[in-house]
From Swiss-Prot:
GO terms for cellular component: plasma membrane. It is found in: Cell membrane. PROSITE patterns: MSCL. The lineage of its organism: Bacteria, Bacillati, Bacillota, Bacilli, Bacillales. Belongs to the MscL family. The keyword Glycosyltransferase does not apply. It comes from Oceanobacillus iheyensis (strain DSM 14371 / CIP 107618 / JCM 11309 / KCTC 3954 / HTE831). The chain crosses the membrane at residues 14-34, 73-93. Channel that opens in response to stretch forces in the membrane lipid bilayer. May participate in the regulation of osmotic pressure changes within the cell. This is Large-conductance mechanosensitive channel.
Length: 130
């Protein structure tokens, strides 16, 4: 049982997932700070100094805190956009690296083709002399 657990726990995918969760948490903290400390105050200035988190409607004794919802929605949009940009950058970087590898393989094949062509021509010359 211990052996099976060890094999499961130390597979590459599990470790990659653990690293992704830790990095994602750190990234989330950065984005949250960015939203709370930069975006929210700027939006407050744009809409006339309003702090979204304090916006509410009182109905009887109940308070509907729609400002918190607006803030959560803004946080979500910014986090989603940040993740989109990060993934887009990583995909572009990966694609560029793959293209470079393909170009290297094509270049290598071209050299091989050139050598094979030279060998073929030399063999033709030798067979024509005989």
């Amino acid at each position: 049982m211990w052996k099976e657990f060890k094999e499961f726990a130390f597979k590459g995918n599990i470790i990659d997932l653990a690293v992704a969760v830790v990095i994602g948490g750190a990234f989330g903290a950065i984005v949250t700070s960015f939203v709370e400390n930069i975006i929210t105050p700027l939006m407050g200035v744009i809409v006339g100094g309003v702090d979204f988190t304090t916006l509410k409607v009182t109905v009887g004794e109940a308070e509907i805190l729609y400002g918190n919802f607006i803030q959560s929605f803004v946080d979500f949009i910014i986090i989603a956009f940040s993740i989109f940009l990060a993934i887009k950058f990583l995909v572009k970087f990966k694609r560029q690296k793959e293209e470079e590898e393909v170009e290297a393989v094509v270049e290598e094949l071209s050299k091989q083709e050139e050598l094979l062509t030279e060998i073929r021509d030399l063999l033709k010359e030798q067979s024509n002399k005989n």
